[in-house]
């Protein structure tokens, strides 16, 4: 105190200025560990023999956290819709003069309804609140049926998907049932959008993909089991769900490598047949604007009913889907 202010502590007054000093300090930052848990529900099968086999249905319960500072919701929404239609999948583009004129005009129109709302929370309504709720709805539905599927159903809400498939990796490394007793895994990740105005992805040759009223992307359904892929198609038409399946993101060598980027992969690498259901990307992907008011709930309901019928078919058929595709090395790397 004497060196900086020239007086002892007892003589200091508020606002006093002292001399400049140089300080060397070593600061060590440590993040405290937090436990993250998968949530697993089991519905026992009704057949004494087949009940020891399992159909796994999953989603992920995490998202990407918070922003360092609050941003204006309308500004983020309009900017991404015009400049970054694939959200975080796009490069950090800044836009051009024509786009900014369009942004300013749309913001001015929105401001007529009141001031903007600042937000710093990535809610993840579609990614993957939609899939998580779809799995919960299926669990409740099957639990209320008088006649349960012959095989048991495993409902799994994976933690840490956004950190690198942590929860699904842990689940398949330490499964609560014998790993080879899981006959298939159905993964729902982002099933709440898919409109004609959404850029849902890119084809392998760089063409934009767009959604529509009956839109649904499938990834991986025939990579390990042709039989599973055929079953998914048969249920879609036979049960009159009438989705138009888009397989463009499942192309071999696709640069987005989506087959390796969601929880189904951690099952597939152990040669468990999988299907990844998604309505695809959009301008709110990993953005503050991924909020519930933008979910297409009737479309999400249709996806949920489709997957429930597929799970029931897998649960009741005589044989498990045969693995006839190229088997994977669970310790190897993933390349679509």
Spans of features found by a protein language model:
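Solvent-exposed loop/turn segments at secondary-structure junctions
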Residues: 30-33, 47-48, 61-65, 160-164, ...
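Beta-strand segments within the central parallel beta-sheet cores of soluble alpha/beta enzyme folds
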Residues: 54-56, 150-158, 184-187, 324-326
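His/Asp/Glu-rich mid-to-C-terminal helical/loop segments that flank catalytic regions of hydrolases
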Residues: 278-336
